[in-house]
């Protein structure tokens, strides 16, 4: 195995751990988890949740350092559009587009003292345009 494959494997493992941390965080915050890793040819959404009457499509991002910015800053417009595409597919299969929907980001920063988790509600809109930055 080359170093690049090892690093990629480490990133994937960290990503899976971040998704588990995000799911537990959202559950404790009162979100109902509806689905995980809903994927289509056009995109994927990490978590589908319900907060009250709102269906929330959640992108989970993680970093080991904020020296280059927080994990939430790594969601570009292209990634947001892919999440929206997967969310649209999920909504059409599960109640239709008339549901109230929101696109959130959960940022997990792995620190020595333990992971730091932040929720950004409405991080981008249904067209993939950022709402936070």
Curated annotation (Swiss-Prot):
Gene3D superfamilies, A to Z: 3.40.1350.10
GO MF terms, alphabetically ordered: nucleic acid binding
Superkingdom: Bacteria
InterPro entries recorded: Restrct_endonuc-II-like (IPR011335), tRNA_endonuc-like_dom_sf (IPR011856), UPF0102_YraN-like (IPR003509)
Family (UniProt): Belongs to the UPF0102 family.
PANTHER family with a match to the protein in the record: UPF0102 PROTEIN YRAN
Name of the protein in question: UPF0102 protein Anae109_1947
